[in-house]
Amino acid sequence: MATDETKRAAQEFLAAQFTEAVQIEEERLNAQAAFAFAPKVWKRVVETFMAQCEAWNAITKTESLTCKETILGDLRIRCAGKPDIITVHYDSRKLQVILRNTARPEHEGDSTFFIQGYNGGTEADLSRNNQRANLEVVVLGELRVLAGIGRTAK
């Protein structure tokens, strides 16, 4: 004979199983979305860098930043009069975007971002430390470091 406590425990068990199944399905959908939307995310990264460089140059009224895509598809950004360079590399197999900025202090390594799916597989975006990355802020910070004026305004 089942007591109320037994019924409650069995219901909790069923709820936990259902929640776990839903979580597994969402993770599967998000992984599929990451692969499906990765080229679009990379395109947005390229467009953001290009747009920020164009805006920077429009404000300075000179070609102080040059942003070019290499034959391999990487981005290279240079600042006039500076020896340093930003290289942005997209690894489609690992779903990674790697930013190398030679103007960064040595103790700061490359910035690695992952392309992850979100919202049950309906979208994908860059993330770092399992948090969505604000691409515009990241790009502006990297350009500021490249130009030698520091990551943030004083």
Where do the model's predicted regions map?
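Eukaryotic low-complexity, non-globular regulatory regions
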Residues: 1-25
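Generic signature of mature, soluble extracytoplasmic domains
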Residues: 61-78
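Contiguous, amphipathic alpha-helical segments that mediate oligomerization or scaffolding
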Residues: 18-66
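Alpha-helix boundary/N-cap detector
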Residues: 1, 5, 33-36, 40, ...
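Intrinsic disorder/low-complexity polar-acidic segments
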Residues: 73-154
